[in-house]
From Swiss-Prot:
Organism: Haemophilus influenzae (strain ATCC 51907 / DSM 11121 / KW20 / Rd)
Keywords (A to Z) from UniProt: Cytoplasm
Name used for this protein in its record: Protein FdhE homolog
Family: Belongs to the FdhE family.
Entry-linked HAMAP family: FdeH
Subcellular location: Cytoplasm
Annotated Gene3D superfamilies: FdhE-like domain (3.90.1670.10)
Gene Ontology biological-process annotations: protein maturation
Entries under SUPFAM superfamilies matching the protein: FdhE-like (SSF144020)
Gene designation per UniProt: fdhE
Function: Necessary for formate dehydrogenase activity.
């Protein structure tokens, strides 16, 4: 990995020099509030309004759980500086299962018949069964867990990882410009990338689908294979073009890119989900998605 999380001593060494941060860490409460509002706004007159509103309910349940049951201080001193919270190797606290229970309790009164059946299954699942499904998802074996269950399990895991990321040093530096297609904090996939405004004006940051951190990657470079060639931008509405798909002819993948200058309220997860018809268009052109939205998991293999 090419981005290193700095130790306390290293932070002091670079304290007097300013450079754009390699990693941006989320403000959990603000993130959930903005995402839920954006999902509800995008749901208006949208063909998939019911699912966007369901996603908003999940996000609001994450916020409620965060406020009622915050993650206690963890023993994180001996972590690696490269992917310190690696999703596949980091020993997670079982509190994530409490988060799952609380999220399910919040959603249950609003659930339709199909969602209620999923909730009932997860409520009856043993701790070992839940941990096994979590292990598969964190290992990116998404096809081994049904998508209806994955959404809830991932919501709980993400709430845990987001809070754990608040407890590690928040300074970082780029070691080199290679291998930036995974999150430098937890090693997970991006949802999409965002071209920012404000102090990071014009810089592109990829948004992690697990710990919600963002990391800088130069524009005009494939987010999957690092190629600078055969890159194209696509959109369904060229006039607005708030959300575009960047395709790479070298690896035949794509990832969406969003532009805060066109709408400061754009939100990676919400706007990615709401632009699912752009995904369909890209797949019809033969490109495979290189990222993952926490509300769109692949179908389980039979």
């Amino acid at each position: 990995m090419s981005i290193k999380i700095l130790s306390e001593s290293e932070i002091k060494q670079v304290a007097n020099s300013y450079q754009a941060p390699a990693v941006l860490f989320a403000n959990p409460k603000n993130l959930y509030q903005r995402r839920a509002k954006r999902l509800r706004d995008l749901a208006q007159n949208h063909p998939l309004s019911d699912y966007l509103l369901f996603a908003a309910d999940i996000v609001e349940s994450q916020l409620s759980t965060l406020e009622k049951n915050p993650l206690p201080p963890q023993q994180l001193e001996q972590l690696n500086t490269i992917e310190p919270l690696n999703a596949k190797t980091f020993k997670r606290n079982s509190i994530w299962r409490e988060y799952l229970t609380e999220i399910l309790d919040e959603i249950k009164p609003k659930a339709n018949e199909q969602i209620a059946a999923t909730i009932e299954f997860l409520e009856k699942a043993s701790s070992a069964e839940l941990e096994e499904m979590a292990n598969k998802l964190l290992a990116q074996e998404f096809n081994l867990v049904s998508s209806d269950k994955a959404v809830f399990i991932w919501a709980a895991l993400s709430l845990y990882w987001l809070q754990a990321a608040q407890q590690i040093p928040h300074n970082s530096q780029v070691e080199n410009a290679e291998n930036l297609h995974h999150c430098p904090v937890c090693g997970s996939l991006p949802v999409a990338s965002m071209v920012q405004i404000g102090t990071s004006q014009g810089l592109r940051y990829l948004h992690c689908n697990l710990c919600e951190s963002e990391w800088n990657l130069v524009r005009a470079q494939c987010t999957n294979c690092n190629s600078h060639d055969k890159l194209e931008m696509w959109s369904l509405n060229e006039e607005l073009a708030l959300v575009r798909a960047e395709t790479c002819g070298s690896c035949e993948s794509y990832l969406k890119m969003m532009f805060q200058e066109k709408d400061p309220y754009v939100e990676p997860v919400a706007d990615d989900l709401a632009s699912i018809f752009l995904d369909i268009e890209m797949e019809e052109k033969g490109f495979a998605r290189s990222g993952l939205n926490p509300f769109i998991f692949p179908a389980e293999e039979a």
